[in-house]
């Protein structure tokens, strides 16, 4: 357009020059000054016409731009309606799925994903989101497949992928909008450059045409001033645009931070879910292990019951043997007095048997106690495992509750931040609306001013055209007058010649001629005066035209400035609309995020309810366990030694609970500090908002000052126009006769006015449309306010729920304190029961119990109390083991005594029948001895196998005792226990010693057989002697053999293996009894064997 206008200017300038040349050629002899003035006037008129055409073109461009802006506004409204419809659909579907038990996340969808396939026509970049259908075929994909389930990790990955794709869509849309803005700015800058170039060309032409004029210099100065003002206004607009860009960047950064926080929260939730799954698997494994241990304990209990039943059967057999011996005692007492020595021996044996019976009864009672102890120990271990599991579950639940509280606090903080950002966005939106309203008002004012200026310009153009017509008519008159004057001069010359020729003839007419001549002179003077007045009028008209042209140029410049302002305002309005779109998008995103957070909070509430139900179930199980514990306490008064381990664990749990309480206090302090930080951040944000508001106020004040200046300039121009109008009216009154042509021009201008009126009506319609849009935006803003109020109510309900949770937590703390007091009471009862058990076991050794029990100061020190309880329990275990060893030794002695009694009865019967039969029986006894050897060999093999099993058990016990040794090494007062355990490690060496003893005793048995072979000739020689002496001698031999068998039994590996490993006291008592028995027997070569055995036992003790 600018190039065409410049070409038309050049052509018209040539036409004007040609016209001026023709006119000057036709006039011929005219004055040069008048010709120059007419040429300038013609050029000015041509330039004015060109400027009017250019203004018309500019008005058409403005109309097109307005239509384009209205089309864009309509498209934006349609997009907003589509977005609202899609969001309503998503909400309705989410409500349906939530009613059906499924959760739907709207966060992964955005406005760009809901446009459909129609957007592909205007795409300038490659597609990025998988949710759009960019195909031209219009194939629609399923939009509502973005349901999120927080159970599986795949759904989380899908949600993250969709969220990432929506972010990419937003970034691509931002890039597209940025490119569109850049194109629009480039187009506007290009149009500004073209207008500048056109103005420069016009100024150059005016300078070339009107170099001597001063008005052109003024116009140039004025144009330069207007350009400076335009530059300043552009700089202000650019600064404003930069500020808005910074605000948008800050908002984008805040959104990115929030998205990063949301990603971090999702990662934390995933980690927690994985940890919970691992903990579940660990709990299942522990349950399987506990089941296996329970099955093992039940099998051990069954084996112990079988052993007890076997012991009972053995006791019943022993009682039956004892009764048989009691029946046999009176029969033996009726025998002759020769058997008194034998009766004394029988009494001694009876006393030993009674003693052994009492010891066996004691051992049976101890075994029963041990059985009960083992059963109760297994049950206590089960209870302990259950308590440990429940404590672990409590710890895990407490950790989960703490994590959930932390997550809730973090999410509350995020919600507060989001609310602050929403308030900031609302404030920014309000300020944008206020600015937009101001700009609308400014646009309306500027349009009114433009209309008035166009009206004034048209009026002045009409006046200028009238003045031009008057000037042309005056020129025509002047030319006519010149022609008339020339013709009159010629006539006067002819008349003068005639008069000179006919002076005489026309003397009478001289007076008339003189009078006519005077009249003509007067007329000539009048014509000259008229010419001077016309010239003056022409000069005045030229000045007026110059002033009008300058004013016209100023008006055109002002119109151009106003058009630029309108363009800038429209661009600013477009930017504000984009910002409004962005703010709406951010509001939708924030709404989606709030919905997602509300869903997550609902899920968290469900999890909390589930956890509370689990806690109630645990409480019920704890109450049941308490009842079971009370029942067990009633039944386990004698066997409460193992509860010390429970006390240790309870103390450790108390420490852990104290640490947890400390962590809770630290967390509360951290929460308070974070709340203070949030308060400071809120104050900073408020200060920044106040600063932004101040800046906006400054900008508004600057705009108002610019408006005031503009109005002042307009008022000055109006005054100047009024003055010129008065002058023009005075001039128009003189030229009313030639107003017919002006009427035709007025009709054309009326048509233009009608066009301008139609344009004004269009502008009013646009204003009404914009007002309707503003009303719609206000309604949307009110709806957003209502939603925010609802969200605030929801947040208040959540705060009440958190308060309830804190109250429940305090109640749980009180319950924990009650449990601690109950644990302390239980520990006191356990200590009392341990002391009673120690008193019962320490009847024979009170000094040991005094050493073990220290002062009452230990109740205040839990560690020392635990150490003392452990030592007491270990002492009780040692006492039990000693008693078990005694029972075993007594059993062996009983078996030996039974065998001896049987052999004595057989020998006595054989002596009564016949000595010969006795010799045969001795031979049979030898054969029996050989069989016994074979049996002993078999028994040795069995014992070897038992030794191997015992070695395996010893290895297991060594592994178990290493742990006990590590614990006992921390207690320096109980080092004697370490020595006992070290002796226990030498059990393998004792087994080797028993094997050596067995070899020795086998050699000793061979020597005994040789002695019996030596006794055979003695028996033959004894046949000649008396039967009584033979019977006594045989009885002595039998007694010696029985003593040897008894010593062999004592030296057997079974007896040596039955010696205890952990005790040294019982071994000291057994040799004394053996010595007593050996002293009662006659010394027939058996004393050195007993001495050897005593010597070996002493070595073993050492």
From Swiss-Prot:
Q: Which residues carry this modification: Phosphoserine?
A: 31, 248, 290
Return the Basic and acidic residues bias intervals. Answer: 1009-1027, 1090-1102
**What GO cellular component entries does it have?**
centriolar subdistal appendage; centriole; centrosome; ciliary basal body; Golgi apparatus; nuclear membrane; sperm head-tail coupling apparatus; spindle pole
Q: Which UniProt keywords apply?
A: Coiled coil, Cytoplasm, Cytoskeleton, Phosphoprotein
Q: What subcellular locations does the record give? A: Cytoplasm, Cytoskeleton, Microtubule organizing center, Centrosome, Centriole; Cytoplasm, Cytoskeleton, Spindle pole
Q: Where is this region: Disordered?
A: 326-346, 991-1048, 1070-1102
Q: Which residues form a coiled coil?
A: 215-822, 878-959
Name of the protein in its database record: Centrosomal protein of 128 kDa
Q: Which organism is it from?
A: Mus musculus
Q: Which gene encodes it?
A: Cep128
